[in-house]
Amino acid sequence: MATKPQDANTTSREAITSKADSPPRPTALIFDSGVGGLSVYQEIRQLLPDLHYIYAFDNVAFPYGEKSGEFIVERVLEIVTAVQQRHPLAIVVIACNTASTVSLPALRERFAFPVVGVVPAIKPAVRLTRNGVVGLLATRATVHASYTLDLIARFATDCKIELLGSSELVEVAETKLHGGVVPLEVLKKILHPWLSMREPPDTIVLGCTHFPLLTEELAQVLPEGTRMVDSGAAIARRTAWLISSQENVISSQDENIAYCMALDEDTDALLPVLQSYGFPKLQKLPI
């Protein structure tokens, strides 16, 4: 088996909870096209458990992996603006590799608060590989992004980088979080280009925030000893540093909240999952 990673008016669905008294704390927005960003949120919450967290996901335009860069930039700006109009944001984390590779410059130009993005953990993977073959598992948009190719050119000149783009795997991760079973045969089919290699990658970069949610299943399919790395812990450390560096941050006593772009049967089913992550309320975000 492979080893696991190392390092306004709104309609709402609410849990019946009582507000516990809590000290004021800065507000952090975690955004993803789907629920994969919860893997990044987990890492951040471990370091910063007392922040006021908002999780927003774009279940109308999901998945972003097949969308144009122009569409993604406009969409992310629209959503972050809508949240910012309702909450005093101290920091925004774009917990989506695809969105990060295209939208960060526009976000940083528009907003005064820091914006953190997620990029493939190619540099640490290069340090870990033993056979000199590193696999990048991401959406097709991330695999072909100029930012990704630049990372490879800067940090992986002495390694062979095998690229594998899959939007299907994103759907599989979403299915798992909704309570579905992950068929290993589906994973084997997706990973076949690597599994059929004479010398497959011994280190895999999980280049989509959805994929750490599947590490248990991926470990059953990948060759024994394969390492998987993602950038979640590094993003958490960066977020903690940026929060600690701010002065006169507006704090909130509100409870954590999740926003989606449309309420439907799928979001109804997702509410218990969000509650387990510490988000008692799920509301539609008017944009």
Swiss-Prot record:
Transmembrane segments: none
Family recorded in the similarity comment: Belongs to the aspartate/glutamate racemases family.
EC number: 5.1.1.3
Matches recorded under NCBIfam families: glut_race, PRK00865.1-1
Keyword Translocase in record: no
Catalytic reaction equation(s): L-glutamate = D-glutamate
Keyword Isomerase attributed: yes
Region (Disordered): 1-25
Residues noted as binding substrate in the record, renumbered to the chain: D32, S33, Y64, G65, N97, T98, T209, H210
Biological process terms in GO annotation: cell wall organization; peptidoglycan biosynthetic process; regulation of cell shape
Top enzyme class: isomerase
GO terms assigned for molecular function: glutamate racemase activity
Record's function text: Provides the (R)-glutamate required for cell wall biosynthesis.
Organism: Yersinia pestis
Polar residues bias: start-end ranges: 1-15
Pfam families documented for this protein: Asp_Glu_race
Annotated keywords: Cell shape, Cell wall biogenesis/degradation, Isomerase, Peptidoglycan synthesis
Pathway: Cell wall biogenesis; peptidoglycan biosynthesis
Protein name stated in the entry: Glutamate racemase
Active site: C96 (proton donor/acceptor), C208 (proton donor/acceptor)
